[in-house]
Amino acid sequence: MKKLLPTSTAGSLPKPAWLAQPETLWSPWKLQGDELVEGKHDALRLSLHEQQLAGIDIVSDGEQTRQHFVTTFIEHLDGVDFENRETVRIRDRYDASVPTVVGAVARKKPVFVEDAKFLRQQTGQPIKWALPGPMTMIDTLYDAHYKSREKLAWEFAKILNQEAKELEAAGVDIIQFDEPAFNVFFDEVNDWGVATLERAIEGLKCETAVHICYGYGIKANTDWKKTLGSEWRQYEEAFPKLQKSSIDIVSLECHNSHVPMELIELIRGKKVMVGAIDVANHAIETPEEVANTLRKALQFVDADKLYPCTNCGMAPLPRRVARGKLNALSAGAEIVRRELLNAR
């Protein structure tokens, strides 16, 4: 991106009420068959339009065609049985009913490539596309086949690499891997987590990003955050390894969190998507609040490597709130952009 402080969203945006139940994760579709296909594309267009109206520079699909950032990808793979479910502990903090790996996992056909081509036809702006990361995928399943988290992660990394290469060919500019599990399983991150992420990006010429956050604004996550104390230093565990990795961009949570801003120093040299919008409450930030977060970040990251962003996806928020937050993100970035240009 040539523009200084290009804005983007971390992931999902709210779906329209005619497509799925608002403010709900894993909400079932309200349409079926051809109507659902058309409805998803209509929602994707609408999501793009709202990003453009807000002045977002790097746009996305708003994850309008998927029910969930992890399970929708897994649904398209062989070797996973969604009828045969088990209850597992997700991110080591809440129980969920998840599908079971019953055989060798494989991707017989592209998952999101047609959606990406459709989005590419709608805009000339840079596009970022999010995929679940290998470690977060294995943490959202019960494995009755490989019986090894690491082995399954390597298999998913190969599959993600196939998908990512086709997304790149479809015109995607940045491919982001969502890895909230990196904030929880520190030994695995350093033993093989970052290595499997490297496998997922192997051979890509487009830019790559990893998004690590403290989750959506749902009760299980907000309750967990209350146990983390006055300083959240989880990033300290993964950042040194990521700093040495081939990943181009690291996306992290900042605003209204207890993450010490100086931890960004640990990924010096990387581009940093700084979360300047809190997704865990309905209060809409002022542009000045956004600008303050960005000014603090600029102490630890060069201006040409700072990408203002949201802390996480906004699927569970009311559309009005998400719209207001996107507007604040753009306006706050513009304040700091002007300050930087005037100082030159």
Language model region names:
Residues 1-344:
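Domain-level signal for soluble alpha/beta catalytic cores
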